[in-house]
Swiss-Prot record:
Keywords: ATP-binding, Nucleotide-binding, Transport. Pfam families: ABC_tran (PF00005). PANTHER family: ENERGY-COUPLING FACTOR TRANSPORTER ATP-BINDING PROTEIN ECFA1 (PTHR43553:SF24), HEAVY METAL TRANSPORTER (PTHR43553). ATP binds at residues 107-114. The keyword RNA-binding does not apply. This is Putative ABC transporter ATP-binding protein MG303 homolog. It comes from Mycoplasma pneumoniae (strain ATCC 29342 / M129 / Subtype 1) (Mycoplasmoides pneumoniae). The lineage of its organism: Bacteria, Bacillati, Mycoplasmatota, Mycoplasmoidales, Mycoplasmoidaceae.
Amino acid sequence: MQTPQIIWSLIAPQYRGLANKVNRKLIQSSIKHYFWYCKQFDKLVHPFYYLTAKKHTPLFNQQLVDLAQSTLYFYNLSVFVDKSNAGQIIKNVTGSVEPNQITVIFGPSGSGKTTLIKQLGLVENPTCGFLNCGNFYYFANQKHNRATKQFQNSIGYVLQKAEEQFLCDSVLEEVLTGAINLGLCQKGDVNFAKKYLEMCGLHHIPLIKNPLELSGGQKKRLALASVLAMQVQFLILDEPTVGLDQEGKALKSALLKQLKQVTRIMIVSHDVDFIYETADSLIQLEAGQIVDQMSVADFFNNMQLLQRYEITPPLVVQTIQLLQAKGVQLNDPLAIKTVHDLIDQLKPLFHDQ
């Protein structure tokens, strides 16, 4: 692992002199000394903490800007089972999550997918490495400060089992609680709640109903509505299609594609058909390491990659391959994401006959 370096192009001009000094310190620090800094003095609160340790106030992260439209970078992230650095779960991964895109973390069970998204959302703290988004930097083992809290408030996390994040006894309270805590609405604001319930297809649900009495699909949509009500800039969903029928998956896909216009979205999923229809980019994990990062279309149309990872192609990709093997020439195969897209490209062929 290399010691982290501050990305020069992301530093405002007035801070570049400070950044240069910090980079020199990081270059001179061995890995052993780097961890010693983290564990003994906990001085890596942000890139410039070296220079402000006595004041305990950040010079750079006082007010976060451009989170929604900035790429989220992660560098050399590692996660160990315990403080003795035994049992490495995530192994020095580096990558990025682009704004206005849906990025999927993909890989076999036990590869570290859920662990990775928890680090990126700061639900859990990485053992080493750092995150950067806009003018926000977060180093492993640092103390949480105002900037960290602001970044965390910009993130919405929807668990695989939605009921595990329910806190209230009614649908109305469940949607409003997080937004009230952030000062976005008042208690009992029915119109505010209805806006997000309608967005998630729950306009017909009684507001006084207990969330635990909803169906599995409705619970997932309610959990999403409560997160969206907090007006997050980064949405993380763990296995969003588990327990959903085809109609529910189609609704979820359409909603996420609409939401990506105003936020970045990261999902963990094994559902190749949903991924192919919905996501833009893919990060492939194997045994805690990133082995590929590319567009979803390129990944699922690369038969060598799919064979290497023993992945069954999405149904629509299999259908396209069968048609092409029969000599059917499609206008733009990579643009076909759903059966409806395929039918639209096949219609002119039948009309020509």
